Amino acid sequence: KPNNIALSLKNKKTKTIGIIIPEIVHHFFATVISGIEQVANECGYNVIVCLSDESFDKEVINMEMLANGSTDGFIMSLSKETQQKKDFHHLQEVINQGMPVVLFDRISNDILCDKVIIDDQLAAYEATNFLISKGLKKIALLTTVDYVSVGKLRTDGYLNVLHDHGIEVDENLIIRIEDTEHCDEKINELLENQSIDAILAVNELFAVTAIKLAMAKGIKIPEDLSVVAFTDGIISKYSTPTITTISQNGIKMGRKAAEMLIKRLELEDEEDEHYKTEIIETNLIIRESTKS
């Protein structure tokens, strides 16, 4: 078996892919890594995973460290702070050096590179539409602050479907949650002050928190309140009641991102500037948290 270190010095190829993700709490990111790892291993690549912890500085440091000869290319999802700052110089520098980058989930249109996403707007539209089809009208949205790209797109999908059904948008029902620490009080406030019959949550954590707080108030799920969440993770499958979710197909997303990156790495000599954005299908998995 050839010695990898010797080979990489000879070819200037490390056969290693750097992954930078914003956090590891969400099951979604774990599934994406798993998909990347599968394809990387099938193609003889190793994977190094770094966390930006939603911090711009940490994202830059991780990138500089990995671009310093220890990886051939990157797969990443942007941190909240990077999206807020709209500062992508670190990505631009790496791309200018000729290192391929694939962005997934939280992307920016300001960066020219390959991307893998779901149609966040359409997925939120379909999930809200599903709730409306069950005769529910007062649908609250638990989302992120607008500078997080996926939160903004999911909010747009929710607004579009209400508009299409002629349901008036009530801003009091749109709860933008900055971070998980304030999640409880914001959701509690919503349940105390608004009469709602459904919730769309942009992640599982918001959904399970809403269910827990609602049940503590004697609100029955799904009789009094239906809940749908993004991400088909472990929480949704095992919470009581189980949660109706939009599956983001993280494994598929990871596999696709790795395939795109490796294709770029192996193309090498042929300058192919046509960047692609691949859209992964989502599907609604109906469980106990919504009216049948």
Which residues fall in each region the model found?
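N-terminal helix-turn-helix DNA-binding module of bacterial transcription factors
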Residues: 1-15, 291
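An alpha-beta-alpha
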Residues: 125-167, 270, 274-290
